[in-house]
């Protein structure tokens, strides 16, 4: 769990529309835990990932039960995948959104009717679950256009994005009375621009004439965006007279939009340079371990559990290894192994890219590039919109070893076409049974 887990649980326990989080992941998690046990949500997230991996392997012509078990076992042992899937947070839905968009775009012919509907719905929910997913999936739409997937294929890739935007508009209108994708998201972008410097310089140059609330803090604004957003003593949460501000991030959003617009007009090249610098910083941060301590959980999760879940679930939470601070030492021992696996996987993924390009395998090339663009796009989006943290990139970086295992040695195009159909497995079973003298009707 993480400190934000309490807010997502509160979305259905209270129920509550949290100002800084889409009303998406809380209801999604509720479908599986039903306010009984969070052990319903965690296996469900793992099964969703497993199914996506199975279908991806199938459309590539590589799906067999033993091969699938081997891939899942390797991901569980050597990557951050189980650490993200095992967290009651929307982090795991970022790679889910990427894989859904990839399969809808380049694996459509290999999907059954139910799978097409399922991945469309799942892709919409996964994309809407975290605002940083929107630019990531937009990057995949651009990729589809660059690869000339065709207008139907591009529309299929764009379906999760369009559906997510519609879902966010409706939920924010109902919950906040504002027809907006992110009613108060400007506060987060302002925090990033202040920490990087451009917005802080704008405030210093325009104050006190501008009359902004933040003019009172010109020249002494925090240089850490997390401090600005969450520390009780920050200008966002405490007025110059020392009085605490309730939901300061929500209240500052209109002024934040004005300052952001002024900053972009005055210092656009500097903002772009900072975005690229933060992108590189985020791309290099992908280790597990920054959400695993008792301190990372904070004090907001237990009260929600106590209010909405049985006492047995609260007792399990209190007795968990995370609350005993036993998880981070284990994670620290795995970090060197994970880093080595990523380094090796990057080489195999690049070789697979070259082979798919030389073979003119459009399906494999599109799916592989979708994964690679999704990984880098995630770093760009989170680096631009937030302070770089390991968990932001750890949630998707396991897709690189997955790509290395699935793509580095693909079957011949004829074999791929025969084995990518959803009915191919059952057809193979029928042929085997006929050879054994036991035809299946």
Regions found by a protein language model. Name each.
Residues 1-8, 16-28, 32-36, 181, ...:
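Extracytoplasmic catalytic/substrate-binding loops of multi-pass membrane glycan-assembly enzymes
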Residues 35-44, 277-371:
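Membrane-interface anchor segments at the N-terminal boundary of transmembrane helices
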Residues 39-67, 73, 77, 96, ...:
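Transmembrane-helix motifs of polytopic, lipid-linked glycan transferases
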Residues 83-93:
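Short acidic/glycine- and proline-prone juxtamembrane loop motifs at membrane-interface regions
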Residues 101-118:
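Membrane-interface transmembrane helices that cradle and orient dolichyl/undecaprenyl
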Residues 116-130, 141-142, 160-170:
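Membrane-interface alpha helices of multi-pass inner-membrane proteins
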Residues 132-146, 157-161, 182-183:
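Transmembrane-embedded, aromatic-rich helix segments that form part
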Residues 182-313:
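Membrane-proximal stem/loop segments at transmembrane-domain junctions that anchor or position
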